[in-house]
């Protein structure tokens, strides 16, 4: 089953006269990792280059049962080029993650993510789930003012997201966790904000 990720810019602050948020655009992303090896992600960039979607085939961890494993972990690193015109800088405002957990008694899953512009250090988040669970989840990461990192003024940047999902079980009970979406709801939503600069 393919998993959908939608990356979209929601540009929130007022524009300077010489550059507008309409000039900000996203490029073709690069990706890699055990959760998104080469050839397992389909990328669609919108005509206005303001949003893109990625379809994942393998971002899922499974343990117990026929796997014979008590622990599994996968990761995915994504790099998205962001064109930033002169007179503007951008920052990440929040990112939402959607997925699914099937966790029996005593099983756990853990989702970790850090996001940053290349060459900078950004915030990192961790969310742990404990069984019994058999449901979708939504993780909302809204950055505080102290955690926001701005790009250089008028400098094109790569927006990087390094994420991992792991699951652990006991007594060979089947458990799984994924970053996914079963409908048109995005699995990951990136919201950017921007400001004028000199």
Where are these regions (language model features)?
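Cysteine-clustered segments with highest specificity for TGF-beta superfamily mature ligands
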Residues: 53-55, 134-177
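Short, solvent-exposed beta-strand/turn "edge" segments of beta-rich domains on protein surfaces
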Residues: 64-73, 82-91, 102-104
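Sec-dependent signal peptide recognition
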Residues: 2-8
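N-terminal leader/pro-regions and domain N-caps
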Residues: 20-65
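Proprotein-processing/basic-patch segments
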Residues: 167-198
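An exposed acidic His-Trp-rich patch
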Residues: 91-144
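N-terminal signal peptide c-region/cleavage motif recognized by signal peptidases
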Residues: 14-16
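Generic short beta-strand segments
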Residues: 55-63, 95-100, 162-168
């Amino acid at each position: 089953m393919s998993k959908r990720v939608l990356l979209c810019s929601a540009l929130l602050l007022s524009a300077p006269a010489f550059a507008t948020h309409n000039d900000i655009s996203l490029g073709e992303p690069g990706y890699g990792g055990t959760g998104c090896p080469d050839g397992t992600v389909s990328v669609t960039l919108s005509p206005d280059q303001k949003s893109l979607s990625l379809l994942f085939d393998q971002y899922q961890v499974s343990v117990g049962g026929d796997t014979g494993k008590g622990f599994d972990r996968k990761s995915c690193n994504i790099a998205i080029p962001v064109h930033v015109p002169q007179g503007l800088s951008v920052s990440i405002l929040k990112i939402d993650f959607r997925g699914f957990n099937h966790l029996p008694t005593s099983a756990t899953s853990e989702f970790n993510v850090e996001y940053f512009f290349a060459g900078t250090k950004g915030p990192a988040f961790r969310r742990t789930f404990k069984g019994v669970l058999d449901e979708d989840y939504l993780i909302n990461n809204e950055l505080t003012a102290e955690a926001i990192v701005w790009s250089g003024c008028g400098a094109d940047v790569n927006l990087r997201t390094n994420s991992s999902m792991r699951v652990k079980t006991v007594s060979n009970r089947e458990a799984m966790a994924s970053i996914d979406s079963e409908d048109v709801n995005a699995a990951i939503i990136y919201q950017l904000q921007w400001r004028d600069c000199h």
